[in-house]
């Protein structure tokens, strides 16, 4: 019984994150799981060949497995996620979910409409000789 209530008790003692504008979440782990699952669902609208989708999907699946594997221990989740406090992880996950929607809207995987000028992506001192 005590093992189950310990994380809740520890969280109840936390009155502030110490970060301006970031409130303590009353039940962060289920919300984090829901956000990660929503992100994975939203990624299905982006082609599998997209590098963005591949990267975000791998990272989100990894984070989701961590959160599901800690069995409600917020402290352990914070340690394994390495993103600071759990509220910060929740904020990062929410931002990524918003970005997935924007990337789908922008169709970032499609080729550029206007082809770049020759040398546009070359930095000074790295230019290749012209043919």
Question: What are the residue ranges of the model-derived segments?
Answer:
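Short, charged, low-complexity loops and linkers
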Residues: 11-22, 41-45
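An alpha-helix initiation/capping motif
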Residues: 54-58, 84-87
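Amphipathic alpha-helical segments that form the core helices of the histone-fold
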Residues: 56-66
């Amino acid at each position: 019984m005590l093992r189950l209530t310990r994380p809740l008790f520890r969280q109840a003692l936390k009155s502030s994150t110490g970060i301006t504008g970031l409130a303590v979440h009353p039940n962060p782990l289920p919300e984090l799981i829901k956000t990660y699952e929503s992100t994975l669902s939203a990624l299905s609208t982006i082609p599998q060949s997209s590098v963005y989708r591949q990267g975000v999907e791998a990272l989100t699946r990894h984070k989701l497995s961590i959160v599901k594997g800690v069995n409600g221990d917020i402290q352990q989740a914070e340690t394994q996620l390495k993103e600071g406090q759990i509220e910060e992880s929740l904020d990062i996950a929410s931002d990524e979910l918003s970005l997935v929607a924007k990337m789908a809207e922008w169709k970032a995987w499609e080729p550029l409409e206007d082809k770049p000028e020759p040398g546009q992506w070359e930095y000074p001192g790295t230019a290749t000789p012209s043919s």
